[in-house]
């Protein structure tokens, strides 16, 4: 794409209108409203309301059309003239066998047309050569000076143009024989455009009226037979668009001089010269391509005459010899100088030609007569040819978008409209570039469907579509509206009454034209890219025609009606430079463009779009339409419809006409009747008296057209009996035929008597308006001296509305008068009305009241309210006198001023004294408010109110009293704000102040008579601080230490107070110390992520015996849904503050816990083993995972006797009690194996040892705060010491001592047997290696100092042996199961029962005691080995067994388990059956972590401390022998404080 050499300057924008919805509802009314403005521009644009968006109703899939082909540079008039001129010169040289080559000058193709035109303007070739003015010619062609371009132009002119001009002058034409001139570039061979052949117009195939169907009569296209017969057509067919082809088989003979005795040479074949095409195809965008190189040219021939000549064959006949005579001199001598014409075979002497030739030219030669015949053939009409390809909307859009994107090398939507506009006008003015586009124009909507919804469509319309189908802006509806003239034409005139569709692409254009019959047109762009319009107003239409005719006379000489053919453009800048006013606009999607009568318009498309257009005619068009018919008559142009027929048809039914239309039709009918009378009178004067009636409306239009002016006749026509196929209008009666007048007769539609009758009907319809207008005129002008009443004028206005009278100036005056009268009445009602609305109406001034009275008197109607207005005026004057008296009397009385103000407001009239009265009243009222606000005994006002009062004072008019009060009020506010700022600082400052400081501030601020919010807040804070100090003193001086909850509440309140409190820091330290102790106790007792609180663990489990309650609360604690610290002991928050109540409740809880666990044992013992085959579904055990314990490795809790999956709980390790200091006989001492299992519901804490608890009790003794957890810990310690004493007493009894000795003896026997027998084969690195490896990690040193117990716990957690380190034991134990025998001891029932009861009580304690394990060992030895449990534990300890379930407990799995619990709880009561079937495991118990803590804290094993069990047994045996006969005596019932002193003296 090349930039244009001349920049295009866009014309000014046309008017753009945006109607409101009210205006938009009347399309033709709105167009009539804007016509005075828009008509001056010729075109205008209308933007509908934003929400008016009609649906696109075209069937896109079935819409197929064939577009027209447009070559842009053939559209512009001046460019087409240049192309036609080049075609003529090319044809001139082609006839003589030479192709035209356009030379290049200064790297541009030489404009031959402009060169010839300038030469002619400068006086012609001879004059320029004589005066040597070729340099001036070069300058006028805008070539630079100083390069000798004038001489080059002269040579080109002499070689190419001058021979053609000599020929055009009429003299005999000969060819010049000059040497070729050198040029900067090789000449470009010119390819004739053959515009008429390739731009043939195709008439419409649609079988209805067409507004352009008669512009050009259809011409039969040349057939192949015609082409073969016509050598010129054949030549055009061969040399079509593009380079000429070589090798067509054209043969010619050489023409030589005729000599009688010369021999005929052999035939010689010569190829045609190369041809260079100036304009290529559209896809090449005007690039010039050379078909052949000039190297093939033979420069021995003349440069412009590359041709072959043919010699005449020898003829022996005498007739042929006699024909050898020169056509100029008529002599036959000098035959050797004869030259034979290849066209007509005539002979010429070379010296008889003008100018004479020195020799016979080689190649084809034609005589001047043949050249004249060829070049003078009339040009054919120019038009558009149809494309050969049929498109759908999609395929055309793809082609259009692709073309635009490729042309501009950017996306189509990013190309600015200004760039496209400049490029379009550059292309249409370019001779070199031949860009071709396609335009789907004048597509019939009746055949292809309209873009708007229509009621007679093939499918049902939605309510929205029906609304748009009936809208007046629908282009199918607008032409047939009642106010439109075209609704009275029955025929569907395509393009006028029936819309046409337009599918455009970039650069596709519509040329300068006016609408048929100079009607209105409206165009709506449905969608797509904008359409650029140019318009010229009707007043400049003839000026535009004159300019185009003057600039391109060559086109209009042959086609006078060229502008009516829509095929010619001219640059708007060119028109504007010649004084033609042009406007432009860009029509976007959803916008209308309206063209007014006889307004020339043109334009082009910015890209792919879809538009629809139609014509319409209003009443104001009728005079314009009559003028158009006269214009058509002069141009002899066909009419689309008969204007006379339209007028008569409307006149036949005047009652159906809109009144505006009736008035306009009456005027036109009157003029038409007068003209008809004149013409018929002329006919009578010619002696034509014969006449007959003819129904012209029934005849086809082509049968009633004047043969002279082509006008469609209706009222009358002149015909001849002898020439039945011809008729003329009465304006051309002399052009009918040469027959006698007696044979001619008049054909008429109406008689001269019928026409006045029709006119009278129109007059009656129109006079109804005149009569009404006379009444209105008389009423408004008061012609008879009597004013009409307001009601009479209102009746006249209603009559105009009912009878649809036009919106004339008189009606506007009437409406204006009524509007003024209504305004006066409204003002009067506002003055005299007693309603509340009267007070809301604005006051009027006294001057306005006087003007109102005057206006009511001047109106052309009478109103009875005028007397009431006079009474109001009298009252106002009396009020003025009273106001003046009040203003002059001092001092001013507030009551009198208020009374006068209220009276003035009642009058609703503002007098001049009212402003002064209002100022005095405002001053008095404000001073009264200040006085009340500062009164000592009055209520104190806030700072906001006082500030508002001061602001009000600034708006009051100044006076001495006002100024004084204003100053006092300002001083008071300054002082108050100062104290407020101090109080605010005390409240918000980071450093708090003492109560004494605050008391001083409050006391001093009390003297200010203003309510100060910050001072009040400071006072309240001080009061709260004093109350807080009193509470602290009371709680510190009580009988008992204060509870932690009370101290925390006091600390929270004290921190929020903006007062410095000395007691607060002491309380904070106490609370911090208490929390530190509580945290230390929690770490000691609670497991990691435990779901229990510390108080829950320390207190007895009161719900141990209730399956439903215990498990329900355990589940709720798992989910974090249940917290009942204050409900554990059945005490209220107040009872927890009493130590005695806590101890009593703890004792009661112990008893409930024992009873509950016995009850739970009884229930669970009835359940069968999960490993048994006979299981009762109603008594099965449910694991914490929610599944039934059946068919998998399950363990039974030794406390509650319920069953659990071994994979869902932490299981004990069999050899955790075996120590390296013992022999391997311990592997066979199965009663020492760690097989004890407590479920997560029974063992709730870490169960620390008493040594660890001692350090907590020592810290508790130092606290000056009471904690429920501390008192619970004291009770738990007392309970554990009591149980320990009873356990030691039981172990020291004779029976138990004997059993212990027997058990030791059994272990010794096992050792002896191993010494005498070969030990069993053990794998490498079995238990001894394992125990040796882990001995340093399992055995903890004995710590005597109690203060290091906590550190020992932490260290023990870090040195727990890993399960995988004892692989030898795990491999050995299965082989030893068959060697286990038992029972080892025989326990009598009297001995077993107390021990089992002690065992149960010990398991309930959340404390680890050595005696617990001793009792467990005795009970185990007194029964058979539990091989089932041992086998289960062995299976669970296998590496491949997923028993270590803690590795699978991801957070996601825990959340799913909790969700499962919650879902299972919704809407259900936790009965025993439901809970046992829906039990879930704890998400917070992590067996893997607890396993590492087990050796010290014992999650599921009651005892794993470093004290050797055999040493404990020995200690009890020694005690039987007298060393420690009564251990229980050392544990009397002690108070908590006595327990602490005992721990200091005893070593456990």
Swiss-Prot record:
Protein residues bound to Fe cation: 513, 515, 601
Gene3D superfamilies listed in its UniProt record: ARID DNA-binding domain, Cupin, Zinc/RING finger domain, C3HC4 (zinc finger)
EC number: 1.14.11.67
Cross-referenced SUPFAM superfamilies: ARID-like, Clavaminate synthase-like, FYVE/PHD zinc finger
Cross-link (Glycyl lysine isopeptide (Lys-Gly) (interchain with G-Cter in SUMO2)): 205, 229, 244, 279, 1123
Family note: Belongs to the JARID1 histone demethylase family.
Domain remark text: The JmjC domain is required for enzymatic activity.
Miscellaneous comment text of the record: KDM5D encodes an H-Y epitope that is defined by the octamer peptide TENSGKDI; since no similar peptide was found in KDM5C, it is presumably the genetic basis for the antigenic difference between males and females that contributes toward a tissue transplant rejection response.
PANTHER family in UniProt: LYSINE-SPECIFIC DEMETHYLASE, LYSINE-SPECIFIC DEMETHYLASE 5D
Name the UniProt record assigns to this protein: Lysine-specific demethylase 5D
Gene coding for it: Kdm5d
């Amino acid at each position: 794409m090349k930039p244009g050499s001349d920049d295009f300057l866009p014309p000014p924008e046309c008017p753009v209108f945006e109607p409101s919805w009210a205006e938009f509802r009347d399309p033709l009314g709105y167009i009539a409203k804007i016509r005075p403005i828009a008509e001056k521009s010729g075109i205008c644009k209308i933007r509908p309301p934003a929400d008016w968006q009609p649906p696109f109703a075209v069937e896109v899939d079935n819409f197929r059309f064939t577009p027209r082909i447009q070559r842009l540079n053939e559209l512009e008039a001046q460019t087409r003239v240049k192309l036609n001129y080049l075609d003529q010169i090319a044809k001139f040289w082609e006839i003589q066998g030479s192709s035209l080559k356009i030379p290049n000058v200064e790297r541009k193709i030489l404009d031959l047309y402009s060169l010839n035109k300038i030469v002619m303007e400068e006086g012609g070739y001879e004059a320029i050569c004589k005066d040597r003015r070729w340099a001036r010619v070069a300058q006028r062609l805008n070539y630079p000076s100083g390069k000798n371009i004038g001489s080059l132009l002269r040579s080109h002119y002499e070689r190419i143009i001058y021979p053609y001009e000599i020929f055009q002058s009429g003299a005999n034409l000969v060819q010049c024989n000059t040497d070729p001139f050198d040029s900067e570039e090789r000449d470009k061979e010119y390819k004739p455009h053959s515009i008429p052949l390739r731009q043939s117009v195709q008439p419409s195939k649609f079988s209805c009226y067409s507004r352009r169907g008669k512009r050009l009569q259809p011409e039969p296209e040349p057939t192949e037979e015609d082409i073969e017969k016509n050598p010129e057509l054949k030549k055009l067919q061969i040399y079509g668009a593009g380079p000429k082809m070589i090798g067509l088989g054209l043969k010619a003979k050489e023409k030589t001089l005729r000599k009688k005795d010369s021999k005929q040479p052999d035939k010689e074949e010569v190829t045609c010269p190369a041809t260079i095409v100036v304009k290529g195809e559209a896809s090449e965008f005007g690039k010039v391509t050379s078909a052949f190189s000039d190297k093939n040219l033979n420069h021995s021939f003349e440069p412009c005459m590359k041709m072959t000549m043919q010699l005449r064959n020898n003829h022996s006949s005498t007739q042929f010899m006699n024909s050898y005579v020169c056509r100029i001199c008529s002599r036959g001598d000098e035959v050797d100088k004869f030259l034979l014409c290849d066209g007509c075979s005539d002979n010429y002497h070379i010296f008889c030609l003008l100018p004479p030739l020195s020799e016979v030219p080689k190649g084809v030669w034609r005589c001047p007569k043949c050249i004249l015949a060829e070049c003078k053939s009339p040009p054919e009409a120019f038009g558009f040819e149809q494309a050969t390809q049929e498109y759908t909307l999609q395929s055309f859009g793809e082609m259009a978008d692709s073309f635009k994107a490729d042309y501009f090398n950017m996306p189509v939507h990013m190309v600015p409209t200004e760039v496209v506009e400049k490029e379009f006008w550059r292309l249409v003015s370019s001779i070199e570039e031949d860009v071709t586009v396609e335009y789907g124009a004048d597509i019939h909507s009746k055949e292809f469907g309209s873009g708007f919804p229509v009621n007679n469509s093939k499918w049902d319309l939605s309510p929205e579509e029906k609304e748009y189908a009936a809208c007046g802006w629908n282009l199918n509806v607008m032409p047939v509206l009642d106010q439109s003239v075209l609704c009275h034409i029955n025929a569907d005139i395509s393009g006028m009454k029936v819309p046409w569709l337009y599918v455009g692409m970039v650069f596709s254009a519509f040329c300068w034209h006016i609408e048929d019959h100079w009607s209105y047109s409206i165009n709506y762009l449905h969608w797509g890219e904008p359409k650029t319009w140019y318009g010229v107003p009707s007043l400049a239409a003839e000026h535009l025609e004159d300019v185009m005719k003057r600039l391109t006379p060559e086109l209009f000489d042959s086609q006078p009606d060229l502008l009516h053919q829509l095929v010619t453009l001219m640059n708007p800048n060119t028109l504007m430079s010649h004084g033609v006013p042009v406007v432009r606009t860009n029509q976007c999607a959803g916008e209308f463009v309206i063209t007014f009568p006889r307004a020339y318009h043109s334009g082009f498309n910015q890209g792919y779009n879809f538009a629809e257009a139609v014509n319409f005619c209003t009443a104001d068009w009728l005079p314009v339409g009559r003028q158009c018919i006269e214009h058509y008559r002069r141009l002899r142009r066909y009419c689309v419809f008969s204007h006379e027929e339209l007028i008569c048809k409307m006149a036949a039914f005047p009652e159906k006409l809109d009144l505006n239309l009736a008035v306009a039709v009456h005027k036109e009918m009157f003029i038409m009747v007068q003209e008809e009378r004149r013409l018929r009178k002329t006919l009578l004067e010619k002696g034509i008296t014969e006449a007959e009636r003819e129904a012209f409306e029934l005849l086809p239009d082509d049968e009633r057209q004047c043969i002279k002016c082509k006008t469609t006749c209706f009222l009358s026509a002149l015909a001849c009996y002898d020439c039945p196929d011809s008729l003329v209008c009465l304006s051309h009666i002399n052009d009918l035929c040469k027959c006698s007048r007696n044979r001619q007769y008049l054909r008429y539609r109406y008689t001269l008597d019928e026409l006045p009758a029709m006119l009278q009907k129109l007059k009656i319809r129109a006079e109804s308006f005149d009569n009404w207008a006379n009444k209105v005129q008389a009423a408004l002008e008061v012609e008879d001296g009597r004013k009409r009443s307001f009601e009479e004028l209102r009746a006249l206005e209603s009559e105009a509305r009912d009878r649809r009278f036009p919106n004339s100036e008189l009606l506007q005056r009437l409406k204006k008068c009524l509007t003024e009268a209504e305004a006066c009445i409204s003002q009067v009602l506002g003055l005299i009305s007693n309603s509340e609305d009267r007070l809301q109406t604005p006051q009027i001034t006294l001057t306005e009241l006087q003007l109102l009275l005057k206006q009511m008197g001047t109106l052309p109607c009478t109103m009875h309210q005028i007397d009431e207005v006079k009474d109001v005026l009298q009252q106002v004057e009396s009020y003025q006198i009273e106001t003046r008296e009040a203003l002059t009397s001092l001092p001013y009385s507030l009551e009198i001023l208020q009374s006068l103000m209220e009276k003035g407001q009642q009058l609703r009239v503002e007098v001049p004294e009212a402003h002064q009265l209002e100022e005095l009243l405002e001053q008095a009222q404000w001073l009264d408010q200040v006085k009340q606000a500062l009164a000592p005994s009055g209520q104190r006002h806030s700072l906001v109110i006082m500030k508002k009062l001061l602001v009000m004072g600034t708006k009051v008019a100044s006076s001495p009293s006002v100024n004084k009060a204003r100053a006092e009020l300002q001083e008071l506010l300054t002082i108050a704000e100062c104290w407020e700022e101090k109080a605010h600082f005390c409240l918000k400052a980071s450093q708090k102040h003492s109560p004494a400081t605050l008391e001083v501030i409050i006391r001093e601020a009390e003297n200010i008579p203003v309510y100060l919010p910050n001072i009040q807040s400071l006072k309240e804070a001080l009061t709260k601080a004093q109350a807080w100090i009193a509470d602290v003193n009371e709680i510190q001086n009580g009988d008992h230490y204060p509870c932690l909850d009370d101290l925390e509440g006091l600390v929270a309140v004290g921190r929020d107070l903006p007062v410095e409190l000395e007691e607060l820091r002491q309380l904070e330290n106490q609370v911090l110390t208490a929390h530190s102790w509580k945290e230390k106790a929690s770490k000691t007792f609670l497991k990691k992520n435990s779901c229990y609180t510390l108080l829950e663990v320390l207190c007895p489990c009161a719900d141990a015996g209730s399956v439903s309650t215990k498990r329900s609360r355990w589940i709720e604690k798992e989910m974090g849904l249940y917290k009942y610290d204050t409900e554990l002991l059945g005490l209220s928050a107040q009872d927890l503050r009493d130590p005695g109540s806590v101890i009593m409740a703890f004792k009661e809880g112990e008893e409930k816990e024992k009873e509950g666990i016995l009850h739970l044992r009884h229930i669970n013992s009835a359940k069968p083993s999960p490993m048994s085959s006979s299981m009762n579904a109603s008594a099965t055990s449910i694991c914490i995972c929610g599944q039934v314990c059946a068919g998998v490795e399950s363990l039974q809790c030794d406390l509650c006797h319920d069953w659990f999956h071994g994979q869902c709980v932490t299981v004990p390790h069999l050899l955790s009690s075996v120590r390296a200091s013992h022999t391997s006989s311990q592997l066979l001492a199965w009663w020492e194996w760690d097989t004890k299992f407590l479920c997560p519901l029974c063992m709730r804490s870490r169960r620390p040892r008493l040594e660890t608890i001692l350090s907590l009790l020592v810290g508790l003794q130092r606290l000056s705060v009471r904690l429920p957890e501390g008192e619970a810990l004291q009770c738990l310690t007392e309970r554990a010491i009591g149980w320990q004493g009873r356990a030691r007493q039981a172990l020291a009894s004779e029976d138990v001592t004997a059993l212990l000795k027997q058990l030791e003896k059994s272990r010794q026997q096992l050792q002896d047997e191993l010494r005498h027998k070969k030990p069993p084969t053990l794998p490498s690195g079995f238990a001894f290696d394992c125990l040796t490896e882990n001995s340093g990690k399992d055995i903890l040193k004995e710590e005597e100092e109690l203060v290091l117990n906590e550190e020992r716990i932490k260290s023990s957690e870090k040195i727990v042996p890993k399960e995988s380190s004892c692989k030898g034991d795990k491999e050995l134990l299965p082989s030893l199961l068959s060697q286990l025998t038992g029972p080892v001891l025989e326990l009598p029932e009297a001995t077993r029962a107390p021990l089992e009861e002690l065992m149960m009580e010990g398991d309930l304690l959340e404390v680890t005691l050595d005696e617990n394990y001793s009792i467990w060992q005795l009970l185990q030895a007194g029964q058979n080995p539990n091989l089932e449990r041992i086998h289960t534990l062995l299976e669970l300890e296998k590496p491949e067994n997923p028993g270590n379930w803690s590795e699978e407990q991801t957070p996601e799995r825990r959340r799913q388990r909790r969700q499962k619990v919650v879902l299972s709880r919704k809407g259900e009561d936790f009965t025993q059956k439901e809970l046992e079937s829906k039990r879930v495991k704890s998400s917070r118990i992590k067996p893997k972590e607890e396993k590492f803590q087990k050796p010290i804290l014992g999650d599921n094993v009651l005892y794993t401390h470093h004290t050797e069990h055999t040493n404990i047994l020995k200690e009890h045996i020694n005690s039987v022998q007298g060393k420690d006969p009564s251990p229980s005596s050392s544990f009397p019932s002690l108070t908590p404080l006595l327990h602490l002193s005992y721990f200091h003296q005893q070593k456990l």
